[in-house]
Structure formats: C-alpha cells, structure tokens
Regions:
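Dual-mode signal for accessory low-complexity, basic/Gly-rich regions
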Residues: 261-461
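Active-site bordering "gate/hinge" segments
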Residues: 1-291, 295-301, 316-317, 400, ...
Length: 461
C-alpha cells in the first residue's frame, strides 16, 4: 500500500492540476488491538489496521469534501479529488470560508515519520493479570467481565499552501465489571490506559461487591451526592460537546445564550473558582495540537486544517471564558477563534478535598455514585440532562458506606451542578463511562452536590 505521505502529495498535486483553488488532504493510519472477557474467561481478541482519507477541494470561496475508509491508493485519491472539486464548483459560498493555513514551522510535528502501530503484545500484561483475577472471582462466587483496548492513530496532513503536519496519538482503556453470583449486585471500575494496575482495579471491585451484601431501597428525591471523577467527566463532556457552540449561543439555542444574539461569555456561573480547559500539551493527556477535520460544521472548518491549537479556557475561575468558533465565525463575531480540542480538564484553584474516600469520610449522610449512563440532553436552553446511575449506588452514613441502593434516574444540568457544588476533590486522570469512548483524555475531580435531583427509581440492574 502506498505510504500515507505519498498519498497526501499525490492528492495535493492532482487537485492543483485539476484547477482547484486550494486543497487539503488528510490520511489517518489506524492500528487497534483489543481483548474482551466475560463469565471469568476471555472471549474474543483481535488486531486490525485501517486507513481513512479525506480530501477537501476549494473552488473560489466554496469547498467540497470526500472521505473514504479502506485501501485507498493513487487512483482512489484521484477519484476523491474529482468528486470533491465537482461538489465545490456546485456549492454556494461557504459560510466558513477563509484562506487556507499558511506554512509554519514545528519540528515536533514531523510529516516524515513512519506510522506507528500497536499489536497483541501490548495486552500481554492485562491478560496475565486477568488469569489470576478470574481465579479469585470464581473463589468468591463472583463474575468478571469487561474489555481492554489500545489504538494508535498516525495522522498526516498536507495542503496546497505547502503546509505538512504529522501526529501520533495513542489511546488505551481497560474496563472491568464485577457481578455477584445472583446478578443483583454489580460494580465497575475503569482506567484510561492500557497499563493500569489491574490488581488495584480488581480490589476496588471486591470492595464494592462487599458493599452489596446489604441493600436499601431509595425513593426519588434530592440527595447529597459524591459524584466521582468518571461522572463529572461525562457531564463536562456533554457540556462542552453540546453547550459550548458559539454560533449556537448567538442563535439562542444553548444555555449560554442571551437576548439579542449575545452570549454569556464573561458571566459568573459558579461561586467556586472552577476552571474548565483544554490544552493539547497537558501532561498525561496530550492530544493533536492542530485542527484536523474532513468536514465543516458551525464550530469547526475544513479551511482551518493545520491551524495550531493552544490552551483554551472554557470556564476560567468560575466565569464563562470562551465558546467554540472556527476562524470565520470568530471573525464575524469579533471574538477569539476556539476550536474543539481532544482533552478536557476541570480544576478549582486551591480547593482540594482529596480522594473520593476522603470525601466519603466527611459525609454524615449521602450517596456515592459509581458512574452515569444513558445521558441525554432534555433542554438545550438550560443544559438540562437526564440519565441513570449504573453499577453501584452506595448509601453513606457517618463517614462510611453502609449499604448498596437501587439505581435512580436523575435530571440535572452540568452548569447548575458547578454552581451548587460545595466540595471539590483532587483532579485525577479519569474515564467517563458513556463518553469516554469519544473523549478519553480527561482529568477530573469528584464533586459534592448537596441536593442532586434523583427524579425517579430505575428498575435497571
């Protein structure tokens, strides 16, 4: 198969020869390894490779795009250029039209590096640890299930301006679920890395299943809740995915809208000094430091491909600081351009309530949640969301977990939760249960919410 760099060069040259006013070619070489397990035994494992090619052709101020996944060679990219250019010539002027990004130097983003790959051996340590875990689960009369996966994506970007960029992005995760023999009790832990301490994860499963020995029934109502980093990460992900659109706010469609097409940027949304930010060079969760997209939306533009990304504070010290805009949208609105960044961090100044266990020890009566699931937005104007607890709701009394409780549906807004939080734990590397698949790189604290709205009892188990 033709090397990715040669495919990029061929696409750019083909577009120039076809009379395109500009061109962007992106090639992503993917490599994936995984293992799945259930009923205390491994069930499947595999390794696969992938290639995704995207072409953007510019005609005047219009753009056309084409994307293919699979074995794409020179003939394939020629077909893609022709299709993208035909679409561009037939399209009206693009709302996100802007000059393509000019050449800028960054030796760290080498276009010449060979694609990196993963293979089955990266899972050897996990598989070795699982063998002992399965034995201990059988001895306890418990059942373990879950999966481990590792991806390496090598991205190549080239444009008709002469810009060339490359980036390697590894991503890993291990999810572990334990269930009691009767299936009535369950616990979940996960780590966003392929090399966790599986024994530590396993011990946490056993601790939580021990809590399941005594159960209580809870009714709907408002409860003091310790929301763990996983749940906080999922809610902050939904807030940034759905709520941080600058165009959406100006159109009156989000929680950060104001009358007359204005936005709430600059307004305080929390008395605590929360800072929610994204930064491609944040230690431990580094990510692609330039714009790379095969399609435009109201917030991201194909014209911005290759543009360097720096740190963006979405919320700074309790006030809304930025919304998401591409260059054209930012220019129209007279604000800073702020693209999507593939990581997310929540901190709260000097506030550090310690670990989840530390926060439990300071709780007179409340609930400890494991994670959130089936999170869906109900009202974009308030960022109201509904969802379910999953794999463990625990009753805390006098600083200790005393029983497990039933699952409960919640109705809450992430913005309101930040406003009502009374304690913030130590930010840690975390993995959201629902959105971790899409946003693996997060650092989140646990939050204490004094009046979390549990709207109805769930029969889920």
């Amino acid at each position: 198969m033709i090397p990715a760099q040669e495919l990029v060069e061929h696409g750019v040259t083909t577009a120039d020869g076809a009379g395109a006013d500009g061109c962007v070619v992106l090639v992503q070489e993917g490599s994936h390894a995984d293992v799945r397990f259930a009923l205390n035994q491994t069930t499947t494992n595999g390794v696969h490779r992938s290639r995704t090619v995207s072409v953007v052709a510019v005609a005047g101020t219009a753009a056309g795009t084409a994307t293919r996944t699979g074995v794409v060679g020179e003939a394939g990219v020629e077909e893609m250029v022709a299709a993208a250019l035909a679409d561009a010539k037939a399209a009206p002027p693009a709302e996100d039209a802007f000059s393509l990004v000019e050449v800028h130097s960054d030796p760290a983003l080498s276009f010449d590096r060979a694609p990196e790959e993963t293979d089955a051996s990266v899972l050897d340590e996990v598989l070795s640890s699982l063998s002992g875990a399965f034995e201990r689960a059988r001895a306890r009369g418990a059942v373990l299930a879950g999966f481990a996966e590792h991806d390496v994506a090598t991205l190549y970007l080239g444009t008709s301006t002469g810009l060339r960029r490359g980036h390697v992005q590894p991503t890993g995760a291990v999810n572990l679920v334990g269930r009691t023999a009767d299936g009535k009790g369950s616990a979940w832990v996960a780590q966003p890395t392929i090399a966790p301490s599986l024994r530590t994860m396993e011990e946490e499963i056993w601790r939580r299943l021990d809590w399941e020995r005594k159960t209580v029934s809870l009714e709907a109502g408002r409860y003091e809740v310790i929301l763990p980093p996983s749940g906080v990460g999922d809610l902050m992900a939904t807030l940034t995915f759905y709520g941080m659109s600058g165009q959406g706010a100006e159109d009156g469609r989000t929680v950060f809208s104001k009358e007359g097409g204005a936005t709430r940027v600059g307004e305080a949304i929390s008395a605590l000094p929360f800072t929610l930010y994204s930064d491609p060079v944040e230690s431990g969760i580094e990510c692609t430091p330039f714009v790379a997209t095969g399609a435009s939306s109201s917030e991201i533009s194909v014209f911005d491909n290759g543009l360097p990304i720096g740190r963006t504070d979405w919320i700074r010290e309790g006030s809304l600081a930025h919304l998401r805009y591409h260059r054209a949208g930012a220019a129209r609105s007279g604000v800073e351009m702020a693209p999507f960044v593939d990581n997310l961090v929540l901190r709260c100044g000097e506030h550090d309530g310690g670990s989840v266990d530390d926060m439990v020890a300071r709780t007179e009566r409340g609930l400890l949640l494991t994670c959130l699931w089936y999170i869906r937005q109900v009202d974009p104007a308030t960022a109201l969301e509904t969802g379910l607890t999953r794999d463990g709701v625990y009753l805390i009394e006098n600083g200790a977990v005393v029983a497990a409780a039933n699952n409960i549906r919640f109705n809450e807004s992430p913005v309101d939760l930040l406003a009502r939080a009374t304690e913030v734990g130590t930010p840690v590397r975390s993995l959201g249960r629902e959105f971790g698949e899409y946003l693996n790189r997060t650092i989140m604290p646990a939050l204490r919410i004094p009046d979390y709205n549990m709207s109805s009892v769930s029969q889920a188990s």
